[in-house]
């Protein structure tokens, strides 16, 4: 479910809204059951975090299957670069959400107190992503800037 979209107040008042929080182990177990296989057979451990939901993990796996990408042998930086270079985000809206999540995950994995420059880049790109979503700006310039400034490619 994409809860980022605005819902009219009249509709919202007539709906039940369930907020479910899963632990890390619950997310992994649910995903394993949905796949009928271990999640680690599909994904590099770098992609699995405490914030991962079964839906996000399944979307990532489906994306990899459709695009013939082996996520087990690919790291996060390489996957982000591949999505940006191949412009996969232009073909499917769900890929945009995926790449935004991957960018945030990249920063979360690499930001440290000692690296002030990366913390500043993290804040800068979070604001830029928010503005891109809010004002419907061009994603390509955002992703190219991220690739150049952060991934250094």
Model-derived features: positions:
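AAA+ P-loop NTPase domains with strong preference for DNA replication initiators
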Residues: 25, 32-153
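Conserved AAA+ ATPase "SRH/arginine-finger" region at the nucleotide-binding site
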Residues: 16-28
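Sensor-1/coupling segment of RecA-like P-loop NTPase cores
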Residues: 1-11
